[in-house]
């Protein structure tokens, strides 16, 4: 873990990264106090290279089920905050009003895509193969963008498109489709 963190610190410094995101994609159960301490330590380390740390939370994480759970970990920690991902927010049935009620500075990064509310696929299969170009699914993208902006987040939004069909496109076509799909919601 230490070696990986050092590599990420060096990379963030070289690239001048605005932020990184971390989370519990493997779904390990942990005590909230332990997670908060670790998040604070990582945030302090990355402050040395002027890179914010965002906590991304997932449906498979048994420690975070709500915005309030996530805020219990990040609130009051300098150089850290939430990293919102529409995909996970929809799959976790996060109330967008809770996002809108966050304070300026609570969110350090945000990414979106489109997808389907319900499928018969496993979490992993759906996550890597059904994150669609915005406008090609049924996610309430405009509502989520509005809520995220209402929270005071005024940084650029990222796209995270992971789908089998998207990976088959040429780079030129993929970039254009991503740009056109994403920009219609911003």
What kind of feature is each model-predicted range?
Residues 168-186:
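C-terminal helical cap(s) of enzyme catalytic domains, especially alpha/beta-barrels
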Residues 20-22, 53-55, 80-84, 108-112, ...:
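Hydrophobic faces of well-ordered beta-strands that scaffold small-molecule active sites
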Residues 11, 41, 143, 147, ...:
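Amphipathic alpha-helical segments that form well-ordered structural scaffolds
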Residues 1-81:
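Active-site acidic/histidine proton-transfer and metal-coordination neighborhood
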Residues 3-4, 34, 38, 136-140, ...:
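Soluble or luminal CAZymes and related metallo-dependent hydrolases
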């Amino acid at each position: 873990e230490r070696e990986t963190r050092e590599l990420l610190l060096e990379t963030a410094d070289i690239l001048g990264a605005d932020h990184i995101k971390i989370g519990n994609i493997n779904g390990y159960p942990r005590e909230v106090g332990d997670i908060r301490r670790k998040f604070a330590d990582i945030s302090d380390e990355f402050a040395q290279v002027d890179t914010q740390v965002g906590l991304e939370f997932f449906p498979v994480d048994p420690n975070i089920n709500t915005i309030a759970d996530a805020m219990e970990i990040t609130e009051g920690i300098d150089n850290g905050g939430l990293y919102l991902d529409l995909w996970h927010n929809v799959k976790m049935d996060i109330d967008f009003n809770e996002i809108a009620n966050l304070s300026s500075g609570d969110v350090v990064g945000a990414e979106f895509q489109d997808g389907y509310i319900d499928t018969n696929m496993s979490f992993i299969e759906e996550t890597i193969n059904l994150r669609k170009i915005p406008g090609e699914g049924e996610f309430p993208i405009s509502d989520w963008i509005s809520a995220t902006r209402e929270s005071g987040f005024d940084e650029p939004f990222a796209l995270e498109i992971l789908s089998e069909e998207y990976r088959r496109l040429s780079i030129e076509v993929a970039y254009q489709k991503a740009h056109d799909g994403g920009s219609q919601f911003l």
